[in-house]
Amino acid sequence: MSRVNAPGRLAIAMKIGLLAVTSSSAWTVQASTPPGASGQQRSVQAYTIGAGTLMDVLTRFASQAGVAISFDAAQLQGLQSPGLNGSFGVADGFARILGDSGLQAELQVSGTYRLRAAPSRGSVMELGTTTIDGQLLTATTEDSGSYTTGAVTIGKGEHTLRETPQSVTVITRKMLDDQNLNTIDQVMEKTPGITVYDSTMGGKYFYSRGFRMSGQYQYDGVPLDMGNSYVQADSFSSDMAYYDRVEVLRGAAGMMKGSGGTSGGVNFVRKRGQATPQTELSLSGGTWDNYRGQVDTGGPLNDAGTVRGRAVIAEQSRHYFYDDAQRKDQVYYGALDVDLTPDTTLGLGVAYEDVDASPCWGGLPRYRDGSDLKLSRSTCLDPSWNTWRSQRTTVFGDLRHQLNDDWAVKVAGVYTKNTQDIKYAFASGSVAPGSSTTNLLGSLYDYDQVDYGLDAYLDGKFDAFGQRHELIFGVNASRSDKDDFYSVALLPQKQDVFDPDRHIPEPDDSYFIENSTRGGPVKTVTEQHGVYSTLRLKLADPLTFVVGSRVSWYSSKSDSVFLTGGTEHARSTETGQVTPFTGVLLDLNEHLTAYASYSDIFTPQGNYRSQSGSALKPLMGESYELGIKGEWFEGRLNTAFNLFRTVQKDQAQTDYNSSCASSDGYCYENAGKVRAQGFEAEISGEVIERLQLLAGYTYTQTKTLDDIDASLNGGSFNSYVPRHVLRLWGDYALGGALERFSVGAGVNAQSDNFRVSPVSSEKITQAGYAVWNGRVGYRIDDTWSVALNGNNLFDKRYYTTIGTESFGNYYGEPRNFTATVKARF
């Protein structure tokens, strides 16, 4: 297909040029950018385009909308269009113009559109005399103005939420912006079905369906071993400034990477070079001196629009509600997308992030009996010399080639390097009755991690037995190199919890080494690779069967030298581990699809040895899901309800009646088996006109089925995961005389949760609570807007994380506000 660019600025010139071509020619309409135009999914604007040939109407619309569209003139020969009158977004406008022509405008990775035959699908809606295809939104969410998406990419290829037989939530760009979600921790706190738990190292642990999410991260679909270490917990210092969306899958995600946690996975999808010029400036200021500035700019870098760029710079400086802690973030991101041919696009990107912080970590202790000290929420028991420095560099690259209308191949790679230097101390030790002091435990960390990831897959559709099917076949590999030195030592000073001394003298680094209770250098290399395939068979018009499998090879070696004496060499290998996936979808009508699915995942445990000296089998996680999904209002609203059951078995457990040559002197056995089950309900998108909503309710019940300690059988596990969790946020754009205003409101609510102390066996409980948040936005004109966000509006006092008597109890944020000013050019 040849590509010709119409003369830039005048629609009449494009019209004359197009009408002059022969029917066999292929064309790209490259329109100029009208004032106020934005990215791939522009905001709604008014059009008055009279009836005429479809080529004429399509050309005029592309020009006025400021988008580029490629097509063969033969596709439009002899077709007419009634025109377009009214206010529409780009996708909606294309859909209405094309009507029942049998064609659709498909958004490409490059940000341009391509005209292709509309697939035969049962989920089309009849609106008057116009047939509109069910998918108006695309996978890209920025500038869509929506809390839902037209497609997800976490499972390879692009499929609607309704076509995906697993639970997936997408945190769109609008949601990120509306709630000022700037870190992965903040994103996960707002995601339905996810529970966030603070670690003593300042990171977060994420839980889904009763289990911890560990190491299941993707960058643009490329799997990495990010966030799976003590120094980071499950989170890491990545800023959300340069991401388009975050896709969160709940349930076993073995097809993503092979090994990992039972509970789910996360895919971060970055912003790309833009097809039309756009710049956004953002400044915000809030409670506790929380200031942030951001510049996001992009557009075509040549006249043809075949080279597109993007640059994002963000800087944030903030204090916290607890004493003296502060943090500064700097983010730099650049991206380039190049159309090597009309069907081949190369994407490149690089990000650099720097964190300079004086944190307050470790949380608060309790009385020895587990009761609350009732300290002020502003209390920090750490010394003022706590430091945390982190630098992260990430390089992205991908190449996508469209072989024809049905088949495409994509190759993508990611490299990331993270260095962290940490020195801190925190309160560690329960407070005795009649006393007010606790110990201080200090730590020194020098941490380096380099990750590589590569993924390549072929995705295509084919016809057989009178139906249309899809095949995905791919390979991927990842490697993680961790070089860590740490030392933990008890400080000689005590801390008074009711009158803390923040100016405790800072010990020299050598003190931590000379007085180390644990620590030393640790080097770990983890490699895994695999092949995977998914086949979507259309057995009948309403019935689709999905079957997939992955074969994985895994290797990990870790070498530790202990400052207290001795070494440890841990090895774990899995060869040809098969991970299956099956699913079935039944379209009940034009809106609803019922589905059932099974997936599993494995976690290697070969570094544990049994009494016979053999390596333990992998821990296995199995997920069963039965549900129904809905797609409404041309895909602008998605609903889902499911029943789930997850079983985790063969967990390594300590045999305290044995003796082995391990670091703790004990042997292990595959003995643990636990189960989590419950149901989820979720709604995302435009519920009524101008109201965007993301809401999810999750009920989770956990049970220990088999434990080496028989007294635990029948009880719950991970009891700090609440049984009931509600996440809700809505944003409503007012109409009439108040059309410049928008209002948002939401709540994070959960039932009680508890921990049984490993020290005293006391039950430490946090009662259920609800935290209400709100937002008011005002659009000054087409360029400027302002917003005021308020969090914890009723100033609820609660612990967001409960720990033990010794440490790990974290207060939730008190009431706070953030004002934001934005300009878009």
Q: Can you say where each PLM-predicted feature lies in the sequence?
A:
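C-terminal beta-signal and adjacent terminal beta-strands/loops
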Residues: 748-758, 777-825
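Acidic/polar loop-and-plug regions of large Gram-negative outer-membrane beta-barrel proteins
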Residues: 316-320, 333-402, 415-449, 493-524, ...
